[in-house]
Curated annotation (Swiss-Prot):
Source organism (scientific name): Acidithiobacillus ferrooxidans (strain ATCC 23270 / DSM 14882 / CIP 104768 / NCIMB 8455)
Name the UniProt record assigns to this protein: ATP synthase subunit c
GO molecular function: lipid binding; proton-transporting ATP synthase activity, rotational mechanism
Annotated compartments: Cell inner membrane
Family: Belongs to the ATPase C chain family.
Swiss-Prot/TrEMBL site (Reversibly protonated during proton transport) positions: E63
């Protein structure tokens, strides 16, 4: 095999691992955000509106992470900078 084929194959494997890690990280993040929000609401019910606002803000920030990773992954797949 030539170097071009090896680079393309390694990039495809790496991007697959990166996509899986981004999805797993997003799922873990959602779980942590919601569990801590429920704990906070249970502990102090009068803080519910503030906790929900903060939850949605941080959930939106956390949800943008997989989309950024998706863009970088597709960039490496279709416009691979390592192929020169």
């Amino acid at each position: 095999m030539d170097a071009h084929t090896i680079i393309v194959a390694a990039t495809a494997i790496a991007v697959g691992i990166i996509f899986g890690a981004a999805g797993l990280g997003s799922a873990i993040g959602w779980g942590l955000i919601t569990s801590k929000t429920i704990e906070g609401i249970t502990r102090q019910p009068e803080m519910r509106p503030q906790l929900l606002v903060n939850t949605f803000i941080f959930a939106g920030l956390m949800e943008s992470f997989p989309f950024i990773i998706l863009a970088f992954g597709f960039w490496f797949l279709f416009a691979n900078p390592f192929l020169g």
